UniProtKB/Swiss-Prot annotation:
This protein is one of the early assembly proteins of the 50S ribosomal subunit, although it is not seen to bind rRNA by itself. It is important during the early stages of 50S assembly. It holds the Pfam family Ribosomal_L13. The gene is rplM. This is Large ribosomal subunit protein uL13. Belongs to the universal ribosomal protein uL13 family.
Length: 147
């Protein structure tokens, strides 16, 4: 018997919506990365994109443990010498909360063309509304013990 290799055309992609209200950022990111990669499916293969689409709503209400809001920094670079900018997560969550969630998830997917394709299936919104109602997304509950 030969080893089964899934084809991208054979993969059925489901849409999931996740409410990030009071969910710890790292726990949220690991669950979303698992759905994006397709690791929850029996047909998972590390070299094929078998993941699902994920919509994260209420990104502005995500929780950070400890004193990370003030201490943890998010870096970006302009590409010019001396162009490294650092922003605290408190400021990032205030101005661009969807970027904070995307940055956490990006660190948990592969750093290659497959990871970039998986990140394109991620949609993050700061508020409770999203424009993907036509896809009929299923609710995905993240169960966590007290933070």
């Amino acid at each position: 018997m030969r080893t089964f290799t899934p084809k991208p055309s054979d993969t059925e992609r489901t849409w999931y919506v996740i409410d990030a209200t009071d969910v710890v950022l790292g726990r949220l990111a690991s669950q979303v990365a698992k759905l994006l990669r397709g690791k929850h499916k029996a047909t998972f293969a590390p070299h094929v994109d078998t993941g699902d689409f994920v919509i994260v709503v209420n990104a502005d209400k995500v929780a950070l443990t400890g004193n990370k809001e003030q201490q943890k920094l998010a870096y970006r670079h302009s590409g010019y010498p001396g162009g490294l900018k650092a922003t605290s997560y408190a400021e990032l969550l205030e101005k661009r909360p969807e970027r904070a969630v995307e940055k956490a998830i990006r660190g948990m997917v592969p750093k290659n063309s497959l990871g970039r394709a998986q990140m394109r299936k991620l949609k993050v919104y700061a508020g409770a509304e999203h424009p993907h109602g036509a896809q009929k997304p299923q609710t995905f509950e993240i169960t966590q013990i007290a933070q």
